[in-house]
Amino acid sequence: MVRPMLLLSLGLLAGLLPALAACPQNCHCHSDLQHVICDKVGLQKIPKVSEKTKLLNLQRNNFPVLAANSFRAMPNLVSLHLQHCQIREVAAGAFRGLKQLIYLYLSHNDIRVLRAGAFDDLTELTYLYLDHNKVTELPRGLLSPLVNLFILQLNNNKIRELRAGAFQGAKDLRWLYLSENALSSLQPGALDDVENLAKFHVDRNQLSSYPSAALSKLRVVEELKLSHNPLKSIPDNAFQSFGRYLETLWLDNTNLEKFSDGAFLGVTTLKHVHLENNRLNQLPSNFPFDSLETLALTNNPWKCTCQLRGLRRWLEAKASRPDATCASPAKFKGQHIRDTDAFRSCKFPTKRSKKAGRH
């Protein structure tokens, strides 16, 4: 009697196993259930998938709250897609157990609240996309588990302020996108934990002054985008801490009126600068023309006097003809800076030839 009962139990278990490992209803599965695609299939709760699943695409479904342990039974997941899922809240421990996860896509949701602990266990996460949500703040320690984070997209949210410790723990972060938020200030210390940033985009915010203190600990920024902020002026030593690495700088559409004389101190590798659509009439004497390859200048009221002779010389040496014209003096108004006679009487410095040293 024992043997028939044992056989019956084994039979029931065998029947259960395929169901547990089966492809979720209305989804498409590939690579022996390693890739599970449930894009826009009307899901309202996270489906059960095989433990060997590596890619799970749940885009365009409806998960208002990601509760704790929502994905705990998926230990081998590497890539998780949750875009356009009407998510409002991510609870503490929502991704607990996903210790192999590298890609996490949470873009285009309605996320307002990210609880402390939301990203616990995500020690291998490298790419985090939180753009196009309604996040208003980053709680201190939120990113602490993300010790391997490389790219963080937070553009198109509602963040008003960055406080000290906002990026605590994310020491390997290299690309940070904060474009199109509501930032009016970057507090001193806000970026101290991510001193290895190479790309920092904070354009289309409400920064009314250049955040010198917040940027002072950054060491290797190659690309800095500050477009569409009401900055008006750039102070001395603005880029000095990362001046040996800075290659691309966006300051267009900022109502910028002036650079301090020492604004570009320490900047030696700058190649591309965007200054269009501002209120500039001069450039500082130490503007780094020597390394420059492209310079966007249009729609500025340039004052064509000898103070601008460095720009004239740079333009003469370039095959391209940036559309920059004089606004003053009156007799040169509308003339191209490259062609005008406004600089005829200016003395241009000449490069001295090196003399042989004494032996």
UniProtKB/Swiss-Prot annotation:
The record ties this protein, via InterPro entries, to: Cys-rich_flank_reg_C, Leu-rich_rpt, Leu-rich_rpt_typical-subtyp, LRR_dom_sf, LRR_TM_domain-containing, LRRNT
Sorted keywords for this record are:
Disulfide bond, Extracellular matrix, Glycoprotein, Leucine-rich repeat, Repeat, Secreted, Signal
- Record's signal peptide: 1-22
PROSITE patterns, per database record: LRR (PS51450)
Q: Which GO terms describe its cellular component?
A: extracellular matrix; extracellular space
Gene3D superfamilies linked: Ribonuclease Inhibitor
Domain called LRRCT: residue spans:
300-348
From what superkingdom does this record's organism come?
A: Eukaryota
Q: Does the keyword Phosphoprotein apply?
A: no
The chain positions of domain LRRNT read 23-52
In terms of SUPFAM superfamilies, this protein maps to:
L domain-like
Residues with attached carbohydrate: S144
Compartments in which it is found: Secreted, Extracellular space, Extracellular matrix
Free-text tissue specificity from the UniProt record = Present in chondrocytes at all ages.
Disulfide bond entries = C23-C38, C304-C346, C306-C326
State the oligomer form and interacting partners: Mostly monomeric. Interacts with collagen type II.
Q: What does this protein do?
A: Promotes attachment of chondrocytes, fibroblasts, and osteoblasts. This binding is mediated (at least for chondrocytes and fibroblasts) by the integrin alpha(2)beta(1). May play an important role in the regulation of chondrocyte growth and proliferation.
Would you tell me the protein name for this molecule? Chondroadherin
Which species does this protein come from? Homo sapiens (Human)
Gene for this protein? Answer: CHAD
